[in-house]
């Protein structure tokens, strides 16, 4: 994974083309799958907060077990809420409906702040370093 990122654009295109031809898939699908794997490898082996995230699976997990034959469009990741200051069992406490709504709102705000203030700066620095380019990841303000 790390080796290919250092190859020239021509070498990368060649391996993508050869893989696409062998698997009878489009180049775009092969390249997209490469980047999904690249991001997963980074998140779970190099990322500062790797011990606080969990791979939820979805399409990627089903694909690994040969349950389906399609490529992932996204990466499903869950955050360990203990990094936000909650105890392991706190989200499971019995609450009234209103208390649960307030708790959900609070954890969503804290998660959003953690991602934007803690995670994104490291992701941008690390990806810039890994890819040798200025890199900017951001949270789309229209995405909720």
Label the model's feature ranges.
Residues 1-144:
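Compositionally biased terminal segments of proteins
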């Amino acid at each position: 994974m790390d080796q290919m990122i250092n190859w020239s654009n021509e070498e990368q295109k060649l391996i993508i083309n050869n893989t696409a031809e062998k698997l009878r898939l489009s180049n775009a699908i092969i390249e997209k799958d490469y980047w999904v794997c690249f991001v997963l490898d980074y998140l779970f082996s190099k990322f500062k907060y790797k011990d606080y995230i969990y791979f939820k699976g979805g399409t990627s997990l089903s694909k690994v077990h040969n349950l389906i034959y399609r490529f992932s469009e996204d990466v499903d990741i869950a955050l360990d809420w203990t990094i936000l200051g909650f105890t392991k069992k706190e989200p499971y406490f019995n609450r009234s409906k209103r208390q649960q709504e307030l708790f959900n709102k609070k954890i969503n705000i804290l998660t959003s702040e953690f991602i934007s203030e803690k995670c994104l700066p490291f992701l941008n620095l690390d990806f810039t370093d890994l890819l040798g380019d200025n890199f900017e990841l951001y949270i789309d303000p229209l995405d909720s």
